[in-house]
Regions:
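Membrane-embedded beta-strand positions of outer-membrane beta-barrel proteins
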Residues: 38-40, 81, 123-125, 163, ...
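Transmembrane beta-strands of outer-membrane beta-barrel pores
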Residues: 42-48, 74-76, 85-91, 127-133, ...
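Residues on the lipid-exposed face of transmembrane beta-strands in outer-membrane beta-barrel proteins
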Residues: 42-44, 64-72, 107-113, 127, ...
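Extracellular loop and loop/strand-boundary signature of outer-membrane beta-barrel proteins
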Residues: 51-56, 91-97, 144-151, 200-208, ...
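Residues that define the transmembrane beta-barrel architecture of outer-membrane proteins
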Residues: 58-64, 101-105, 155-159, 210-216, ...
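Repeated loop/turn-to-beta-strand initiation elements of outer-membrane beta-barrel proteins
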Residues: 77-79, 118-121, 172-175, 229-232, ...
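Outer-membrane pore/translocation modules
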Residues: 100-213
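Outer-membrane beta-barrel "beta-signal"
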Residues: 285-304
Length: 304
């Protein structure tokens, strides 16, 4: 039942984007060879109170992110790579710890060979992990804040390899469907050796450092101008494991809105939704809003 619905969804999705491509004038001319683009964003938000009767906590948060794209096209062959790195922390006046609000390393690379119109046979690689240690925070009997390490660099790490069909309208709109996708989840035994019998760490059983899955995946990207000076970016990744609970689809969806003030300043909103029942059987939500300083990566040498 799930697989049938899964493939119906794919057909509807491709039909929608195909209709879109027919309705919108294609003003993108394919340039052969290499193209690159990217941006560096420094996002900050801050709250301060002094003798504020209603109460409140002083806080400051900052996030640095790099988003880089490398695209190649020649004789029907395409190779599109997106690399994202982001790290952010928050400090509240009532906490002795700096706490992460963002921590992400991700590389997504798709290679395709065109066979008709905007469709290509494809193979892809996706890698995801984080930069720094992640902690679970609590308060002990004395009322002091404590923390326990839960994650770190490469714990967990996700590697996906798959083959399928790649539909690409342009660099701002594409979908990749890979019905044959292998996924490897890696972690240090530091986090699995002390698990109780039957417990798992991101799906990895006690005493092990990896888990292999075989399933299907969908990844898509869409960037467009909502109104003048307001750009929206949507990224979605879906994965279903054929070997274990195929109806539990892992979701990673990110919506980014950039409201331009001038060439270097913008107001930025990021909303991310995650679901992975190997990690937690609940929908995870993250939202960040603030003032961002944005620099085009290609302009950095000129500025320096």
């Amino acid at each position: 039942m799930f697989l049938r619905n899964f493939f119906v969804f794919i057909v509807v999705l491709f039909h929608f984007f195909n209709c879109y491509s027919q309705e919108v004038k294609n003003d993108t001319v394919k340039v052969e060879g290499w193209q690159n683009s990217g941006k560096t964003t420094f996002l900050i938000n801050q709250t301060a109170f002094s003798n504020w009767i209603s109460g409140g906590e002083n806080s400051v948060a900052a996030t640095l992110s790099v988003d880089y794209n490398l695209n190649y096209y020649k004789n029907g062959w395409s190779w599109d790579t997106k690399m994202v790195g982001s790290f952010g922390v928050n400090k509240n006046s009532d906490s002795k710890f700096f706490k992460k609000i963002d921590d992400r390393i991700e590389v997504n690379s798709v290679m395709g060979k065109k066979f008709i119109d905007q469709f290509s046979f494809s193979s892809f690689l996706n890698f995801k992990t984080q930069f720094a240690k992640g902690f679970k925070y609590s308060t002990n009997e004395e009322g002091n804040e404590t923390r326990i390490e839960k994650t770190r660099l490469f714990s967990p790490a996700y590697i996906q390899l798959g083959v399928g069909i790649y539909w690409k309208k342009n660099n701002s709109l594409w979908v990749n469907f890979a019905p044959v996708t292998g996924r490897l989840i890696l972690a240090s035994k530091k986090f699995t050796n002390d698990l109780n019998q039957g417990e798992e760490y991101f799906g990895i059983p006690r005493g092990q450092n990896s888990r292999f899955e075989l399933g299907a995946s969908i990844s898509a990207f869409y960037k467009f101008d909502l109104v003048e000076n307001v750009v929206l970016e949507q990224r979605v990744n879906l994965y279903s494991d054929y070997l274990y609970k195929a109806d539990n689809v892992d979701l990673d969806y990110t919506l980014s809105a950039f409201m331009k003030i001038n060439d270097y300043l913008s107001t930025t909103l990021v909303i991310q939704c995650l679901y992975d029942d190997n990690a937690i059987k609940k929908l995870q939500l993250r939202e960040v809003f603030g003032l961002a300083f944005v620099i085009d990566i290609l302009e950095i040498p000129r500025i320096l």
